[in-house]
């Protein structure tokens, strides 16, 4: 009996020992800290991809269960090495095919549907390649080869754009962009403005000189008639539009007075080139009636004075001294008052001249005067020609000066009376009268500029200054 119990215990011990040999227990307690450390640390992406591929291989091709094998770690390591080798091979193949950054950008943009508009623009025949060359440079601050412009080039380019577009806002937009980007400071912006203004003045002067050279070239009568007055425009509606636009954009006044204004004043005013004066019917009719060649100088003086007053009214509207509606009303009064008073003065001079020079007119002249109204007007023009002080003989220089001065004083007296009338009737809504100090400074500057350009004589400019200083 004791032997039986002994044999039973031996069999039990053998059963307990045999699984240990057939199924070895992994040393989990030793690898646990290493396993936790691997989980907490971030492994390289290539290693994670290789491990994932190894797991795929395991699932797809499970290892064969051979009876003699008790541990598959060797098979796992082999599969892992194969996956890593294949991954490295794929990486090398990708690196061997090099794609330029621009091509890569195009591929990405091809996928992005929001970029299709740029591709459509590429097929637009109206757009040049230079327009798309620097798409992040809308102000054109690069040369054709892509190199940045120098400071002088930028100043020249800004001034040219302002001159071509007749828009002072071009400078403001560019400078505000540079200030927002932090590329320039406030003081540098003021310096840039002065430099651009200087270059812009040179461009205007150059254009004016070119225009004068073209005028000096002989042209046929047919060519000179091509620049006649365009189709009829409602005068005050056009002026009202100009003032209304000026409220929304202060560059309108600059456009009228800076580029076109200075260019106008440097021109020799011909009979068919009165520009905006056609919007003043009374004054324009007066100019058309003064068509004597010997009165051309007085005619140019009258045009210059009228344009100066127009610019002055525009300046008052720009700085808010008067409203656009009041500006239109003032211009209407200028048109009516100056034209009427100047015409009366000229007619009086012509009548006095006729009574002095032709106290006993001949029968021939009497018949011609009574024949038709056209002939009578022609005779009056001839009398006015004889009265022209600028064409008198040199034997009476003092008389010539007095007559010339009297003609100019007649114009200026009409202007003075008109401004006095405006001052008396500008009392609505407690608005201030004209700022006469600004007015005098403005007129003095314009008169000096006209003398330099040869539009006015020194004596005429002094007379204008004297009239305005006495207001």
UniProtKB/Swiss-Prot annotation:
Signal peptide: 1-22
GO biological process: protein localization to secretory granule
Record key words, sorted: Cleavage on pair of basic residues, Cytoplasmic vesicle, Glycoprotein, Membrane, Phosphoprotein, Proteoglycan, Secreted, Signal
Membrane topology: Peripheral membrane protein
InterPro entries: SCG3 (IPR026197)
Residues bearing PTM Phosphoserine: 40, 365
Subunit field text: Interacts with CHGA. Interacts with secretogranin II/SCG2. Interacts (via C-terminus) with CPE.
Name of this chain's protein: Secretogranin-3
């Amino acid at each position: 009996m004791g032997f039986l119990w002994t044999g039973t215990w031996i069999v039990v011990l053998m059963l307990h020992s045999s699984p240990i040999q057939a199924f070895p227990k992994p040393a989990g307690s030793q690898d646990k800290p290493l396993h936790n450390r691997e989980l907490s640390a971030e492994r390289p992406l290539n290693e994670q991809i290789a491990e994932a591929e190894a797991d795929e291989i395991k699932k797809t091709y499970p290892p064969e269960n051979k009876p003699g094998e008790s541990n598959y770690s060797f098979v796992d390591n082999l599969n892992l090495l194969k996956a890593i080798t294949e991954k490295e091979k794929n990486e090398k193949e990708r690196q061997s095919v090099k794609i330029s950054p621009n091509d890569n950008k195009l591929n990405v943009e091809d996928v992005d549907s929001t970029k299709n508009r740029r591709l459509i623009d590429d097929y637009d025949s109206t757009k040049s390649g230079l327009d798309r060359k620097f798409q992040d440079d809308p102000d054109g601050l690069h040369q054709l080869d892509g190199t940045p412009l120098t400071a002088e080039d930028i100043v020249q380019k800004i001034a040219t754009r302002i001159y071509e577009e007749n828009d002072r806002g071009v400078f403001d937009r560019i400078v505000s962009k540079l200030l927002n980007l932090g590329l320039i400071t406030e003081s540098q912006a003021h310096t840039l403005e002065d430099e651009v203004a200087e270059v812009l003045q040179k461009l205007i002067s150059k254009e004016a000189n070119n225009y004068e050279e073209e005028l000096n070239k002989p042209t046929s009568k047919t060519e000179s008639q091509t620049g006649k007055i365009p189709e009829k425009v409602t005068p005050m509606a056009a002026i009202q539009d100009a003032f209304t636009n000026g409220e929304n954009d202060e560059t309108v006044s600059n456009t009228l007075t800076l580029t076109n204004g200075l260019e106008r004043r440097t021109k020799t005013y011909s009979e068919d080139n009165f520009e905006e004066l056609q919007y003043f019917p009374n004054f324009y009719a007066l100019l058309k009636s003064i068509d004597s060649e010997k009165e051309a100088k007085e005619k140019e003086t009258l045009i210059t004075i009228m344009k100066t007053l127009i610019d002055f009214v525009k300046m008052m509207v720009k700085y808010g001294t008067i409203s656009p509606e009041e500006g239109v009303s003032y211009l209407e009064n200028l048109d009516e008052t100056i034209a009427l008073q100047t015409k009366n003065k000229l007619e009086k001079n012509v009548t006095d001249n006729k009574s002095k020079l032709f106290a006993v007119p001949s029968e021939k002249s009497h018949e011609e005067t009574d024949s038709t109204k056209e002939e009578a007007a022609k005779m009056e023009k001839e009398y006015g020609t004889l009265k022209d002080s600028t064409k008198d003989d040199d034997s009476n220089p003092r008389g010539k000066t007095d007559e010339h001065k009297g003609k100019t004083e007649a114009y200026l007296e009409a202007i003075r009376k008109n401004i006095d009338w405006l001052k008396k009737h500008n009392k609505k809504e407690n608005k201030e009268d004209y700022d006469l100090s600004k007015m005098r400074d403005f007129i003095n500057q314009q008169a000096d500029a006209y003398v330099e350009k040869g539009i006015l004589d020194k004596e005429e400019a002094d007379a204008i200054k004297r009239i305005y200083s006495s207001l």
